[in-house]
């Protein structure tokens, strides 16, 4: 129970410290993380529709997995992936590239409305909001930042990617 409380306090602490920075790229990142869960859940839920909407639900699941690798970069180091995919994901390491990436994902999901109105519309709207956050960050010339979520509980407040690297070193030694 204490471990769960520590994890929740670290998540809420990281979330609140990110929102205090008033940087739109952090807002876009948190919205994108929420979108990952919705892509997977709504993609699976819409697979059970009969007809061509199944294609968009499969695309939604794939989008959720790609966004997972874009927004949680340490997964690129711990998962066995091809260099082509890793280089593709690293192209979105900035405000404008992410704005375009999420806008493209939103357009793909908005196209599902041509077949049938489903809950995939929620994913399209969240992709649009995330794209808008990254666009605002670029327009305001805000630095591209990554979340300061502290999953280790060390209080370092460092990047999530660096924290995982520390654990890997500890486990090896």
Swiss-Prot record:
Glycosylation sites (chain numbering): 23
Localisation: Golgi apparatus membrane
Transmembrane segments: 28-48, 50-70, 96-113, 119-139
A Pfam cross-reference name: Cg6151-P
Entry keyword annotation includes Endoplasmic reticulum: no
GO BP annotations, alphabetical order: vesicle-mediated transport
Disulfide partners: none
Domain of life according to the entry: Eukaryota
Keywords for this protein: Glycoprotein, Golgi apparatus, Membrane, Transmembrane, Transmembrane helix
Any one of the GO CC terms: Golgi membrane
Function of the molecule: Golgi membrane protein involved in vesicular trafficking.
Full protein name: Golgi apparatus membrane protein TVP18
Gene source species: Candida albicans (strain SC5314 / ATCC MYA-2876) (Yeast)
Gene: TVP18
């Amino acid at each position: 129970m204490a471990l769960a409380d520590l994890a929740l306090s670290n998540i809420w602490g990281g979330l609140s410290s990110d929102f205090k920075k008033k940087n739109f790229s952090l807002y876009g990142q948190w919205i994108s993380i929420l979108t990952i869960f919705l892509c997977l859940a709504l993609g699976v839920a819409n697979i059970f529709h009969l007809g061509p909407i199944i294609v968009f639900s499969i695309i939604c699941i794939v989008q959720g997995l790609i966004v997972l690798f874009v927004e949680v970069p340490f997964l690129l180091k711990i998962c066995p992936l091809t260099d082509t995919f890793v280089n593709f994901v690293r192209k979105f390491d900035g405000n404008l590239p992410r704005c375009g990436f999420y806008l493209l994902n939103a357009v793909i999901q908005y196209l599902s409305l041509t077949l049938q109105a489903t809950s995939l519309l929620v994913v399209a709207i969240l992709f649009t909001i995330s794209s808008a956050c990254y666009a605002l960050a670029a327009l305001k010339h805000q630095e591209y930042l990554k979340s300061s979520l502290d999953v280790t509980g060390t209080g370092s407040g460092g990047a999530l990617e660096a924290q995982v690297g520390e654990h890997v070193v500890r486990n090896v030694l």
